[in-house]
A protein has these predicted regions:
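Flavin (FAD/FMN) cofactor-binding and adjacent substrate-gating region
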Residues: 77-78, 83-180, 185-196
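N-terminal Rossmann-like FAD-binding beta1-loop-alpha1 element of flavoenzymes
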Residues: 3-31
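Conserved FAD-binding subdomain of flavin-dependent enzymes
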Residues: 20, 29, 35-91, 96-106
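C-terminal lid/capping helical subdomain adjacent to the catalytic/cofactor pocket in oxidative enzymes
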Residues: 3, 16, 374-433
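Conserved Rossmann-like nucleotide-cofactor binding loop
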Residues: 13, 38, 229
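Predominantly flavin-linked oxidoreductase catalytic cores and closely associated redox partners
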Residues: 154-263
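Active-site substrate-recognition segment that forms the wall
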Residues: 19-20, 45-51, 84-87, 221-390
Length: 433
């Protein structure tokens, strides 16, 4: 008989975990719980969707390689190009001037922090003949485009559509979804060896309304995949614990736009990822996607307050959006009349499709937590069943790599929970408080 399993947080990590758990246990014993009235309304749905195979340091390298290969395999098996825009990608670092190239950090440095991968040597390209250079990027005299990825080591997805696919598959198998709903308390029973975890009380919600219903979900296995809210969820359920789950948030504004210079006729050569710098003091990142869209972001802040998860989609800040729109116009707008001169300021043919603000879960040490919490850290004498029959687990803090690491995390976490040998060594991601 499958151990009842509750997953708190139905973002990309939660639905990936449910997807792989349901391959090896009765799907009806898996319960997904999420407080947002609109699923995937934060980092899972508003991320860039950039995938990398080998941009990671030793602790993350095995998980990165596993996840990258699983993204490829899943897309190949389920028509990922059509269903969620999976495509190989070519990555570049871009400097608009020689001065910017010499004085500024590379635009991809923040992504490479802690990696053991050596910087790629600069390569010169003939834009007219390469076929894999981004024709949608505005080029100016004196700029520099540097290849920073090896062929076959980076890719692109639309994260919202990937999340929706995984959730559809879970529900079709029989996984249960409760949303909007939030955890209220754990339920225990003394079987003679301490107060054993046997369930979670959840409060079912209606958007903007008070509590409408309380429900007990029986479980002996509890998984917290609540992104930036993971620490809050743990504290709600285990207020007596001395353990703090140190997940904080990194807020990021983003745009999804259309450009007449990126269209279906160009998608056969794959998508692009471009990292650059901007004189506004931030590092724009832009990713072309299958379907004619370009994702533009890079304006991040660790000081924006984390909203209540049950309020759903966060409201972007007008000033930040205006700054992004101007940077997008400067970087992606039409070229001028020739000679590599930029177009006039009022000449903008970019169409804004979506604007967003999301909150990425991060740790101070730059690596996610994927671990079972020891019973002694839970406190109050609460115990969980041994081995694959029980446990409290946490998976969060993936930072800018949540989508890239999602499938590998789902595989490994499902294996940990079910007592199977893990497909990647994630011992370096354990957490001991």
């Amino acid at each position: 008989m499958s151990a009842e399993t509750v997953i708190l947080g139905a973002g990309i990590i939660g639905v990936s975990t449910a997807y792989y758990l349901s391959q090896h246990q009765d799907p009806s014993s898996i319960h997904l719980v999420d407080p947002s009235p609109e699923l995937f309304s934060s980092a899972s749905g508003y991320a860039g969707g950039f995938l990398a195979k080998d941009w990671f340091g030793p602790a993350l390298a095995p998980l990165g390689a596993l996840s990258f290969e699983e993204h490829r395999r899943l897309a190949e098996e389920h028509g990922g190009r059509e269903k969620w825009g999976y495509s190989p990608a070519t990555c570049f670092s871009y400097a608009a001037s020689a001065a910017a190239r010499e004085s500024a950090k590379r635009g991809d440095d923040w992504l490479r922090d802690g990696t053991s991968r050596a910087d790629a040597a600069p390569l010169a390209f003939d834009d007219a003949g390469s076929g894999k250079t981004p024709t949608w990027l505005r080029r100016v005299d004196g700029d520099h485009l540097e290849l920073i990825s090896d062929e076959g080591t980076t890719a692109q997805v639309d994260p919202l559509r990937l999340c929706q696919f995984l959730l559809r598959e879970c529900l079709a198998r029989g996984v249960k979804l409760y949303h909007p709903a939030k955890p209220a308390s754990v339920v225990t029973h003394d079987f003679g060896n301490g107060d054993e975890l046997i369930g979670v009380n959840i409060d079912r919600l209606e958007a903007g309304e008070p509590l409408t219903e309380s429900l007990l979900l029986p479980c002996t296995r509890l998984i917290i995949t609540a992104g930036s809210w993971t620490g809050q969820v743990f504290r709600t359920l285990f207020p007596w614990s001395r353990l703090e789950i140190p997940i904080r948030s990194l807020a990021g504004h983003s745009l999804v736009l259309k450009s007449p210079r990126w269209h279906a006729g160009l998608e056969g050569n794959g998508c692009h990822a471009i990292f650059t710098t901007h004189d506004g003091g931030f590092c724009p990142e832009m990713f072309s996607r299958i379907g004619g869209h370009i994702y533009f972001a890079g304006l991040n802040s660790s000081s924006l307050p984390l909203p209540d998860a049950e309020k759903g989609k966060a409201t972007p800040y007008d000033e930040s959006l205006a700054q992004l729109r101007e940077a997008a116009r400067q970087t992606l707008g039409p070229a001028g009349g020739g000679g590599g001169v930029a177009a006039a300021d009022d000449d903008n043919d970019l169409e804004i499709v979506r604007e967003g603000l999301c909150f990425r879960p991060v740790t101070d040490w730059g690596k996610p937590i994927i671990a079972r919490i020891p019973d002694e850290e839970i406190g109050a004498g609460i115990v969980t069943r041994a081995g694959a029959n029980g446990g409290v687990f946490v998976a969060a803090g993936h930072g800018p790599w949540g989508i890239a690491m999602s499938l590998g995390t789902g595989i490994v976490l499902a294996e940990m929970v079910q007592g199977r040998k893990t497909s990647a060594n994630v011992s370096g991601l354990a957490f001991f408080g």
